[in-house]
């Protein structure tokens, strides 16, 4: 499977020990399964990366509530659960780093199509801020990484590749570069990090320009985006 092949690739290219486990984070028990796996293997987790996510390729009114609940669990509840489980061991050691992959969308008004995505990412930023407030003085820092459009299989796997295809080339960033910057920022203990200069400027504009303007633009551009699906 994909995880197995990726693990083997890392072993060959970097000469490091790599292990893996397949977990479905829509399952409420998955975070504990992952934690127990690490404890059984006696792995010491000094850096916890929360990177699972996807997008829903349909409008809010057309998406079953069951799917919305799964979405919230993967992007939100599972992150909280994993942090709660692993942070206890970090506190015992007096050190640890947590990376939470958020998004530039956390700073933008909610899209008229991706109704939940932006608000969940905004919550993740605030949650990360809360972790820092409570545990920074005990050697634990949490970094909310807020990338923009990154070239991965995220959009194709989520069924929203047409959205990525319409993004100007200069706004698309390579995943290795974004990942490297994110890891460096997390190890430094940055509380929030926006990769690349392009998206730093975008976030600055999102903070300065009234949200009502972006809401208007979104309402004009978004209708019909997924009508063919």
Residue ranges of predicted features:
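Active-site-adjacent segment of SDR/Rossmann-fold oxidoreductases
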Residues: 13, 108, 130-140
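The beta1-alpha1 cofactor-binding region of Rossmann-like NAD(H)/NADP(H)-dependent oxidoreductases
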Residues: 21-33, 65
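Conserved NAD(P)H cofactor-binding loop of Rossmann-fold oxidoreductase domains
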Residues: 51-56
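Active-site helix of classical SDR
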Residues: 83, 119-120
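Residue(s) in the substrate-gating loop at a strand-loop-helix junction
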Residues: 103
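Substrate-binding pocket helix/loop in short-chain dehydrogenase/reductase
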Residues: 59-61, 67-72
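C-terminal helical subdomain
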Residues: 144, 165-202
């Amino acid at each position: 499977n994909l995880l197995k092949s990726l693990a083997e690739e890392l072993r060959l290219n970097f000469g490091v020990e790599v292990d893996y486990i397949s977990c479905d984070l829509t399952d409420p028990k998955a975070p504990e399964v992952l934690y127990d796996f690490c404890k059984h293997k006696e792995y010491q987790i000094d850096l916890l990366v929360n990177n699972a996510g996807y997008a829903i390729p349909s409008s809010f009114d057309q998406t079953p509530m069951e799917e919305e609940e799964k979405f919230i669990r993967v992007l939100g509840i599972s992150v909280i659960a994993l942090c709660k489980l692993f942070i206890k061991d970090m506190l015992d050691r007096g050190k640890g780093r947590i990376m939470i992959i958020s998004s530039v969308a956390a700073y933008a008004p909610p899209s008229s199509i991706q109704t939940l995505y932006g608000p969940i990412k905004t919550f993740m930023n605030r949650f990360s801020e809360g972790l820092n407030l409570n545990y920074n003085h005990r050697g634990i820092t949490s970094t909310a990484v807020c990338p923009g459009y990154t070239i991965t299989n995220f959009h194709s796997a989520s069924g929203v590749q047409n959205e990525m295809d319409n993004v100007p080339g200069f706004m698309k960033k390579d995943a290795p570069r974004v990942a490297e910057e994110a890891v460096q920022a997390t190890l430094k203990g940055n509380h929030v990090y926006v990769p690349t200069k392009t998206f730093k400027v975008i976030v600055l504009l999102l903070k300065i320009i009234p949200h009502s303007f972006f809401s208007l633009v979104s309402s004009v551009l978004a209708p019909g985006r997924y009508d063919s699906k």
